Amino acid sequence: LATGFFLGLKKFLPNKIFSEKAGSTKNVLIDSMLLDAFDAEPDLVGKIMTKDDSIAKQPIVFEESNGVKFPEEKFENYKGNQYLIPFFEQLYQLETTKKAKVRIAYFGDSMTDGDMIVQDFRTYFQEKFGGQGVGFVSITSESAGSRSSVSHEFSGNWKTQSYLNIKYPLRSFGVNGHVFFANDTVHAAWVKYKAGRSRFNTQLHNPTLFYGSAKNKKGQLTYMIGNDTIRKTLMPNRVLNTLSLSKTPLKQLKVNFKKADSIPIYGFNFDDGVGVHVDNFSQRGNSGIPISKFDVATMKAFQEQLNYNLIVLHYGTNVLNYGTKDYNWYDRSMTKTINRLRECFPG
């Protein structure tokens, strides 16, 4: 019966279900530094596999190497014999004294887009060691609509520069790899946050704006708390400046920026100041290589304010499909990234 029904409708069906036209690339981001690192290997280009390449037919063999041998320890009886000793000691102090603070920077690509993976990672730590708040959130984000840990909206007149495709920004990138400008002199640029639905993100704790230095001393922002409209002036005197908007937790916050052109805006931080906090710095299309362009002085200023105890790098997916099994070029590039992070976040 089903076959007869299908044959009867076949003449009405299209010849092809999927269009052969190229889809929109509006939301497809390309890591320019990844392409540069790949192109910088002249010998590698000639090794790219084709359909007739004999290398493609060779089986992958994993050979034993004289690398670092990790002890066979389980999570339950981990003794900290590796590189995480300071981090676990800080967690121990937090667990025993309830006074220490721990902060984690989680850098990733589209795998952590919309706070995926990271929100569970954050919840686990906050459930065990305390702490409330979603952490640092950018001014704009391509994944704002899919994020449940915080509701995020913004106006369309923000000028955005990302370390993914801008090598020489107008001003230094923030710890999130972005810098934003409210350059529209006619309409005020705005950003709105609303507390999420997860257990430890039901309020916006200690909303604090992070912004950079500029000659413009006339920048202002306005926002409402209850029925009161509050106006504050930006003082962009230092490499990194902070402005606390409320000492009491809020359910939502909408901030309007006026006369703030040329002032680099980085984002807002939301945390209660105790326990563990995790900042998700995800970026679609990122290979991790752009981190090597962080400005050391600016990052040290962020470290003074946020004090990261652990940095997680979650990359690799965007490096695949370049037609080669030789990833030494990526190894060298990521070594530069890690060395730069050590400069930016000493300790």
Language-model features: where?
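Serine-esterase "nucleophile elbow" of acetyl-processing enzymes
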Residues: F75-W158, S162, K194-R284, V296-N307, ...
